[in-house]
Structure formats: structure tokens, C-alpha cells
Amino acid sequence: MSTNQGSLWGGRFAGGPSDALAALSKSTHFDWALAPYDVTASRAHAVVLFRAGLLTEEQRDGLLAGLDSLASDVADGSFGPLVSDEDVHAALERGLIERVGPDLGGRLRAGRSRNDQVATLFRMWLRDAVRRVATGVLEVVAALGDQAAAHPTAIMPGKTHLQSAQPILLAHHLLAHAHPLLRDVERIVDFDKRAAVSPYGSGALAGSSLGLDPDAIAADLGFTTAADNSVDATASRDFAAEAAFIFAMIAVDLSRLAEDIIIWSSTEFGYVTLHDSWSTGSSIMPQKKNPDIAELARGKSGRLIGNLTGLLATLKAQPLAYNRDLQEDKEPVFDSVVQLELLLPAMAGLVGSLTFDVERMAALAPAGYTLATDVAEWLVRQGVPFRSAHEAAGAAVRTAEERSVGLEELTDDELAAISPELTPQVRDVLTIEGSVSARDSRGGTAPKRVAEQLQIVREITARLGHELMR
């Protein structure tokens, strides 16, 4: 049997927990990440206890001095958890008592439970973590924007179903990856509105009878308000699930970008060359240059999706209020942040270092009869109903396929035989440059529209960067 050393409970028990229970309960291997936030919250709690008349000025100052010393030692690594410490809270209380003595150190726990304490610390940690992640996402967006700006007129094959569809600008495609990532950052900004609610003062579930001021401690800790319901405040982890979703969505968006890079860098496509610093080789095949960053991004998306679904499964069917199941809420979220902080700078570097073969992309852009839609729309502009225009353009494709030529290589007689409306003037739209320039609706792939889109992406990026600094 173990002793009760390192725990914040025990008076009701005749002995300590079994070794197996102690090992199962221990959480310092992951919740130590909350230690700096725990000390910060303890400082605010000491002030609130003083305001409530539960500490003298001398006791308050003594606790604050002890907490300052503890914070310094936690920061430089000279203080850490012992094997006997059950969790971060127990370890830090031990550290405080070592510095100020058991009488003064033991007063700090008044009016708070680990239930409201950990819910508060988790929110504090997450609010900082999502900002770091958002900054990394914006760096990937900046890399996409820089590549788009560097290739304002480069044309590539646009795909649907991974089949040739219509010519588009490379910049248009790159910016299409930027927008989902910007929406992810917008989700982070919006998430903070709900995360900025302090559970502190809720106690175990029913609130406090000691005259504490939850609003004051919320303000001291940088929250916008205190929780309206103490049961909800201690029992709910929807904020963690929301963050886990955002992280998973970021990973999915990165995975789609990564998939494009993997395909584009293949010999068969040959759209991009990977920079040596952002790719790897093979242990047996000397010629290989592998897109490992992109492949790891694709793989890690599954990991982050798993973190989200695992957390949701943990949360379902828990009765109110707090349950020990909630010890399992932090590791998946912590892991998602760790993975994104590894992945985002690597993806930004990969994207920024890509070398595009714009001549090859342009040469492949008309392949697969991607100008067929332009033929149909040209006929519409001549007054032909779209149904008939679609049939005529399809027939032109079939004729070109039979001859193994491009649409632009069909003779005037062949075009006229398909439809009398297909006059030689249709050749005006049978170029990839003409096709791209013609699609000048808002959001379209015409160069002037894509230039507008780049400006919009940069404006949104700047706005979000400013909002994250608040």
C-alpha cells in the first residue's frame, strides 16, 4: 500500500491508496504543463482570500512571495513533481509549503476545489495554445500568398475528381488552400469568446460559502467573465472538444494541401520540385526525393481526428457534475497542440520553398479537352440554348478524341459538321489564356480576380493577426 503523501485528500481514509490505484491516478506526466498557470491562479486566489477577510495582509504577502519563488523554480526546472505527487496541484502545494511552511501554505486551498481549479487552468492553457497554433497557421497562409504573388499568370490544369476539368491560375489554386486555413483561425478567434469564461469560485460543484469574488479572480486571470452556473463550470468540457475540433480541422486542411503537393511532386505530374532542405531521401534508392513533410501532415491529420473522437467518446454519458473521467480530457488536446506546433512551421517552409514548373503546367492545362466548357459557353453567347451547346461541345470532344487531336486542331469543316453554329470564330476561346481571362466573375480564375483574392487573403491575415494580439 502507498501512503497518502502527495495527495490533497486523506483525512477520511484509514490508509493510503493501493499502489495500483496510485499509479492509475497519477497525472503529473501530462498535467505538469499546467504548472505555470496553476501558480498564476494561486496568486490571484491569495488576493481574493485576502479581500474576503480570510487572510491577513501579512499572510497574503507571505503567500505571494512563496508563490513567486515557486514560479521561478518551476520556470527554470529546479522544482518539479515527485513520484509521490498525485497531480500538478498536489506537487505545487507541496512546493509552496516547503517555502512558507504548512500553516501558511495550507491556507491557500480554502474556497477552491481541484474541480474548478483544473477547469480554469485548462482554459488558461488553451487560450494561449490556440494563439500559438493560429500564428503557425497564418505562417502557412503567408507562404501560400507569397507563392501566389510570385506566379500571378501561371496557368495549370484545374481538376475535379482528379480528372482534367478547366484551366485555372496556379495562384487561384494556392489561394483556395489559404481560405480554409483562414477560416480555421477565425474559428480560433471565435472560440476564445467561449473559452474566456472563468470557472474559478465554483468549488467542487456548488459554489463557495466563503465570500469569494469569482468576477474579481476572473478579471485578474484575464477572463472576460465568471461562469454563470457552478455545476456547468466544473463539469463541462465542450470548450476542450471545440478546440480539438478546430485542431483536427486545421490538420484536415493541411492534409488536403499536403495531398496536392505529394501528387504534384510525382514524376507523372511534375508540377513542383521539392527543395533539398524540405524533403528526404531513400535508404536504398539514390534517386529518390520524398515529400515526407507532406506525408507526415497527411498522417497526423488522422491522429488529430482520433484525438477529437476519443475526447468526445470520453465526454458522452457522464452525469453531472465532475467525474474522474475528465482526467482524460487533457492528453488528447495537449497532443494535438504538440503535433501542430511541429507540423505548421514545417508546412510553411515546404510551401515557401516549392519550385513550380510553370511551363509544364501550362502545357498540360488543355490536355483532357479542358476547353470544352469554353466552346459550350461561346455557343451560348451566340444564342444557342445551353442544352444544345453542351451536346455540340461534347460532340466536338468525341471527334477530337477519334482523331487524337486537341479541340483547337479540328478543321473548320469538322466544326461545321458538328454544328453549323460552330463557326471559325470559336477559335478565339480555344486558348488557355483566353479561357482563364474569360472567367472574370467574383471569385473566378481571371488574373484580375485572383489579384483581388490575394489582396483579400492578405487583409484577412492582417486582421486576424491583430485580433490574436488582443
From Swiss-Prot:
Q: GO molecular function terms here?
A: argininosuccinate lyase activity
**Cell compartment(s), UniProt:** Cytoplasm
This enzyme's EC code(s): 4.3.2.1
Keyword set for this entry?
Amino-acid biosynthesis, Arginine biosynthesis, Cytoplasm, Lyase
Q: Name one GO cellular component term.
A: cytosol
Q: In which pathway does it act?
A: Amino-acid biosynthesis; L-arginine biosynthesis; L-arginine from L-ornithine and carbamoyl phosphate: step 3/3
Output this protein's name: Argininosuccinate lyase
What organism is this sequence from? Mycobacterium marinum (strain ATCC BAA-535 / M)
